[in-house]
């Protein structure tokens, strides 16, 4: 369509060696685990570059993986190289801290939001809207609709939500709109100002 599209996802997404990626994931997931309640859950999004390492580290650290959501973007960015299929999905792992402790899942609301049918693990939602992107410059910002669904599915009003990679704080905005408490962390100062 003649539009210029940025495909830079940020310095942190460039990875490094598999060993470096694994070590990084182990460290931050272990830190999050320490702060989760016994029946707490964690949601982690990523692309194929990182998500398999994340899944392995979650399992090694004692989490029980509940679902791997496939976020099928209804408006993916174009495939500029034309050498492979257009990349239109991201994966979101939902896991609970303790395999034997029950977690909260708002099954009825998820069913209601899905025309009274069980919600599947494939979520067809658009990528970030232009109006949302105007609120921040984070290259991997997630859409408000995605974070809203995650929060509604797995927390009760008043619950604490931690986002250790807060970026432009879409998670915080969704948490606030839904009556949850929020703590966001980001190592990049430009996103905290």
Per-range role (PLM):
Residues 1-192:
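Core catalytic lobe of class I
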């Amino acid at each position: 369509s003649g539009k210029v599209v940025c495909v830079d996802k940020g310095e942190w997404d460039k990875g490094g060696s598999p060993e470096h990626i694994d070590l990084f994931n182990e460290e931050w997931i272990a830190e999050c685990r320490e702060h989760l309640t016994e029946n707490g859950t964690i949601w982690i999004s990523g692309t194929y570059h990182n998500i398999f390492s994340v899944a392995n580290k979650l399992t090694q650290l004692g989490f029980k993986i509940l679902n791997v959501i496939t976020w099928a973007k209804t408006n993916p960015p174009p495939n500029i190289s034309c050498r492979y299929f257009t990349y239109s999905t991201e994966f979101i792992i939902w896991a609970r801290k303790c395999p034997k402790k029950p977690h909260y899942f708002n099954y009825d609301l998820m069913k209601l939001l899905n025309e009274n049918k069980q919600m599947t693990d494939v979520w067809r939602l658009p990528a970030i809207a232009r109006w949302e992107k105007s609120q921040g410059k984070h290259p991997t910002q997630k859409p408000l609709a995605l974070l809203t669904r995650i929060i509604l599915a797995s927390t009760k009003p008043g619950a604490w939500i931690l986002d250790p990679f807060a970026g432009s704080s879409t998670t915080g905005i969704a948490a606030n709109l839904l009556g949850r408490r929020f703590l966001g962390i980001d190592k990049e100062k430009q996103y905290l100002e």
